[in-house]
Swiss-Prot record:
It catalyses: sulfate + ATP + H(+) = adenosine 5'-phosphosulfate + diphosphate. Belongs to the PAPS reductase family. CysD subfamily. It comes from Pseudomonas fluorescens (strain SBW25). Pathway: Sulfur metabolism; hydrogen sulfide biosynthesis; sulfite from sulfate: step 1/3. GO terms for molecular function: ATP binding; sulfate adenylyltransferase (ATP) activity. NCBIfam families: CysD, PRK05253.1, PRK12563.1. One of its GO terms (biological process) is hydrogen sulfide biosynthetic process. The lineage of its organism: Bacteria, Pseudomonadati, Pseudomonadota, Gammaproteobacteria, Pseudomonadales. It comes from the Bacteria. With CysN forms the ATP sulfurylase (ATPS) that catalyzes the adenylation of sulfate producing adenosine 5'-phosphosulfate (APS) and diphosphate, the first enzymatic step in sulfur assimilation pathway. APS synthesis involves the formation of a high-energy phosphoric-sulfuric acid anhydride bond driven by GTP hydrolysis by CysN coupled to ATP hydrolysis by CysD. This is Sulfate adenylyltransferase subunit 2. InterPro entries: PAPS_reduct_dom (IPR002500), Rossmann-like_a/b/a_fold (IPR014729), SO4_adenylTrfase_ssu (IPR011784), Sulfate_adenylyltrnsfr_sub2 (IPR050128).
Length: 305
């Protein structure tokens, strides 16, 4: 008699199957690493998939230069401890133009430093498949995206031109110049992610845990004062509104565009308990999701993660 797999073990097995399938099927895959909790789980699953061997593909971070300092510290620590083959890419055109989220706004900053930066990196290294940690429960445009998300030669996504995925059968045939984005965590929920992190003891960025932090409220969003660059864009009146609150982050991105939530969750069990009670989206603090109706789908059509 075969024991039934638990819910998390079923998700784990599905994700490992997808990762192995892509590694076997594509010539030059890469795993995108955004340093967040989903990336941590995806990386853990990939290491399990090929243990005791090393990952058969590199890990890539598209760096906007505006991540939280704790994220950079954590990234470098993981690369050293796990012996990862890390590629980092910063859009040189964006750097030359001095693109930043304060002067140019969230939409332009995201387009140039994230979307265009990613497309540059994929073209530069000739990757034909890129793993991403997106989940269907995060946001409506991601809810309708396939596990194998096909992109044309310009990395654009056409949601009306996706292939059916029946059972666990994935069609990876692509024409020259085309590629796919692969989402092994598609069927996971935010709660699944946290329960798996707890059970597997996966290291994550400390920003996910509640602590006293300096924040300022901007348009209803609590923005953390992560370094001095933000102070250059605050008036004296704004600086006077900086307060210390006990907050944590449910999602991590560029720090001026990522809102914190007030919380008492200092441990993984606290976070899981909080997830069982919450009724709000984890991406409520992502400023880029509020650029306009359908903004995430528009970004993805142009090549965003």
């Amino acid at each position: 008699m075969v024991d039934k797999l638990t819910h998390l073990k079923q998700l784990e097995a599905e994700s490992i199957h997808i990762i192995r399938e892509v590694a076997a099927e594509f010539d030059n895959p890469v795993m995108l690493y955004s340093i967040g909790k989903d990336s941590a789980v995806m990386l853990h699953l990939a290491r399990k998939a090929f243990f005791p061997g090393k990952l058969p593909f590199p890990v890539m971070h598209v760096d906007t230069r505006w991540k939280f300092q704790e994220m950079y510290t954590f990234r470098d620590k993981m690369v050293e401890e796990l012996g990862l083959d890390l590629i980092t890419h910063v859009n040189p055109d964006g750097v030359a133009q001095g693109i930043n989220p304060f002067t140019h706004g969230s939409a332009k900053h995201t387009d140039i430093m994230k979307t265009e930066g990613l497309k540059q990196a994929l073209d530069k290294h000739g990757f034909d498949a890129a793993f991403g940690g997106a989940r269907r429960d995060e946001e409506k445009s991601r809810a309708k995206e396939r596990v194998y998300s096909f992109r044309d030669s310009k990395h654009r996504w056409d949601p009306k031109n996706q292939r059916p995925e029946l059972w666990n059968v994935y069609n990876g045939n692509v024409n020259k110049g085309e590629s796919i984005r692969v989402f092994p965590l598609s069927n996971w929920t935010e709660l699944d992610i946290w329960q798996y992190i707890y059970l597997e003891g996966i290291p994550i960025v400390p920003l996910y845990f509640a602590a006293e932090r300096d924040v300022i409220e901007k348009n209803g969003t609590l923005i953390m004062i992560d370094d001095d660059r933000i102070l250059e864009h605050l008036s004296d009146e704004d600086k006077a509104r900086i307060v210390k609150k006990k907050v944590r982050f449910r999602t991590l991105g560029c720090y001026p565009l990522t809102g914190a939530v007030e919380s008492e969750a200092e441990t993984l069990t606290d976070i899981i308990q909080e997830m069982l009670l919450t009724r709000t989206s984890e991406r409520q603090g992502r400023v880029i999701d509020h650029d306009g109706a359908g903004s995430m789908e528009d970004k993805k059509r142009q090549g965003y993660f």
